[in-house]
Amino acid sequence: MEFNLRMADTIHDSYEWINLHTCASSRCMAEGRRIPFFHNDCFCFRLYDISDALVAAGDYTFDPPAYEKTRRSHRIKRILALKLRDKLQIRLPAETLMAIAGLLVRECAAVTAEEQSLGTKVSHHTVDLTQDVYVDYTIVDGVRYVKSLGNTVPKLCNQDHHMLLSKQGEPVGKIWIAEDYRGIRSVKFCSADASLAGPTPIVKSWWRAISAPCDIEKITIRSDGLKLRDILIYDETIPNNTSNYVGWANPEHPNNVIDIMTFDQVHSFPERLLMTCFNCNANGITGYTAVTSGSSVAMIHAHENDNTGFYADMDAAYPRGFFIHMPLDDGEFVTEVCRRYALAAGKWISACLVFITNKGRNTLFGTSGPPESCPVLDRILTPAPNGTQIWFNDSTSVHPKSVRYLAFDELAPPVQRPFPPSLIPNPPYFWTQNTEPWFVSSCNMKGIVDMTLCRDTTLAHRPITGILLEYENGHRECLGQFRFDKTLKKVRVEHTTDLYIGSLRTTCSYLYIADVATSPLHDCGSLSWMRVSRHGTLEWWSSLRHSIVRYTSDTGQLTNMETRT
């Protein structure tokens, strides 16, 4: 039976005698059992009846990263290509095998999940930690998970597949768990005061620790029949602490977490909070990129080793996010991390971050507000010049998606400081004509020697979205939305050469920058060119629809607002 599903709608299936409610809010999901849905092709392709174990094995502990679907597909394709090479009677090139495997990824995943779930069942059982504890592993889509924990080795199992995790009589005060959205990947037992320092072999997973005031004697294991999904302390006298379910990207992390909306230290955590980090002021850092919705920050990345692969992950997680890049000069480092708290467009509460450096650079990772919204900043952290690890919540683990929780060593009360004058905009007239968020960046035109343009070729009109400018003294500035995965060649600019900014409008009349050159391009007759001299200030006002530039000098002010469709 086919249904035309709409959100917040309930459909009655008279054949199965069930109601399908499509709200999917947390309240509705908690009130009743969720109904599993399958692709129609996968359901028709099934070899066996859908079992509870199969549904449980495919259930997610928490929402997976946006990029995980692609990574899982690539893993399955590589595994399947190797199997095809071994099974086929003819020898085919690796490229051909990968192409064939790419057409069978979904079918391979469906059949493998069915076969692995045969003969298994969802179960809960107790493990005595005062006795020997054995661990067994399984492979799911090329990823290793913990299959079972127990006090004995099953007689029919090969003992070489089981490992002794803990010996009888060894006290257990803390349990380290590495997991991803599909299950538990590693378990470590240790004493209450022990840390799990150093590198671990578990990548792309989240670490959390279960601890108790006294030694843990018994635990309850929850399994989906294929792999472990949760571990609980088997003692009703010990409260279930919400911090036991905070996942960290590394087992070595600070313990104090603050809420940047209230500056209160967090003791009761949101369900399945995930914390990741970036290295501030570490050796080799050349700048920072933040993704923002305007009223809040969603993600912060520290640039090192010229890696651009993270952009694909950011695009998948935040398809409508705005990218703000803050470059660093030689010898420059962040001296203050501050919070800007204000009312954003539409009266939304805005809690953005501001980075201030030792060379006077001030960068607001968020939308610019009117002057009355910029009274003071709250300094949250003074990073060490030789490096500080700053932890923030993965925005997909909270609602709304934004950075709300921070963690770092040596927490201190926030300190108010004056708002940097460079971050207080002089709003143009279009500021008051709509409520969409505007992102402002500016630069001095004197002394520029190089510029690198950033063009978004994924859009039909291929706009210039940002510029990285380099000065004769080594200083660097960014205008607009600059990304290193969309850059064009660096252009040398002579000291006396004016810049020409060519603008156009889309079919919806949205203004954008089509080109930036040292002379107007005559073969682009439809462009509206704006001449910018090598003195004065150039501002770039960006929204999710428009790119407006404004040039101010002693002789007056120019904008590209007069550009026609």
Give the residues covered by each predicted segment.
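Lectin-type carbohydrate-recognition ectodomains
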Residues: 1-565
